[in-house]
Design a protein with these regions (language model features):
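Cleavable N-terminal export/targeting peptides
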Residues: 1-21
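Transmembrane beta-strands of outer-membrane beta-barrel proteins
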Residues: 22-26, 54-62, 99-105, 142-146, ...
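Extracellular loop and loop/strand-boundary signature of outer-membrane beta-barrel proteins
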Residues: 27-28, 70-74, 115-120, 153-156
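Residues that define the transmembrane beta-barrel architecture of outer-membrane proteins
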Residues: 34-38, 77-83, 122-128, 162-166
Length: 174
C-alpha cells in the first residue's frame, strides 16, 4: 500500500508542473532521539491573500513522510500523509535573496500510533509548522528552508505527547 501511494504521488508531480503555480519539495527530517526521516511534498501556490494583505501568500502542500527510529536491533518506522495550508510573508532579504517566514496548521494521518517509544493515541494528528525560507535562482524558483514541525492530536484523546521535528528542505517551483 505504501509503495502504491508513493508511486501515485510521484506520478502526479509532473502533472502539477503544467499548472505553473506548482512545485515540489524534499525534506530531511530530524526528530527527538534517533528519529530521522524524509518528506516528499507537492505544493500549489494559491497566491496573495489580498482580502487580508497583498504581501501574505498562501500555498497548499500535500506530503508523504517516512520516519525511522532506533538502532537495527530496536528499529521502528512510521508512514504519514499530510495536507496543509501554509501562510508565507517576506520578512527581509539576505544578499538580494528574499527571506520569508512561513506558518501553517494542517491535518495528517499517521500509520502507527506508537512510534519512537511514544503513544500518540490517534491516527489523525494536526501538523503545525513554523519556518524560514530563502529563495534564489534567476526567477527565484529554488527555495531552501528550515522548519519546525509538531504533530499532535490537540488533546482530543490522551495520551498526547506530540512529536517534534526539525526539517531542512529544498523546494523547486515549475
Amino acid at each position: 500500500m505504501k509503495k502504491l501511494i508513493l508511486s501515485l504521488c510521484l506520478l502526479l508531480l509532473p502533472t502539477l508542473s503544467v499548472a505553473g503555480n506548482a512545485g515540489y519539495s524534499v525534506d530531511y527530517i530530524r526528530g527527538e532521539g534517533d528519529v530521522e526521516g524524509i518528506k516528499l511534498a507537492a505544493r500549489y501556490n494559491a497566491g496573495a491573500l489580498s482580502y487580508i494583505s497583498d504581501d501574505i501568500l498562501l500555498y497548499w502542500e500535500a506530503s508523504v513522510n517516512f520516519w525511522e527510529y532506533g538502532a537495527e536491533d530496536n528499529h521502528d518506522t512510521d508512514f504519514v500523509l499530510a495536507v496543509s495550508p501554509v501562510l508565507v510573508k517576506q520578512i527581509g532579504t539576505i544578499k538580494q535573496a528574499p527571506l520569508f517566514l512561513e506558518a501553517g496548521i494542517g491535518l495528517s494521518l499517521i500509520e502507527d500510533t506508537t512510534f519512537a517509544d511514544k503513544d500518540v493515541s490517534t491516527h489523525y494528528q494536526f501538523e503545525d509548522r513554523l519556518g524560514l525560507m530563502m529563495q534564489f535562482g534567476n526567477n527565484n524558483e529554488h527555495h531552501v528552508a528550515v522548519r519546525y514541525f509538531h504533530y499532535s492530536n490537540a488533546g482530543f484523546k490522551k495520551p498526547n505527547p506530540g512529536l517534534d521535528f526539525i526539517a531542512l528542505s529544498y523546494q523547486r517551483e515549475f
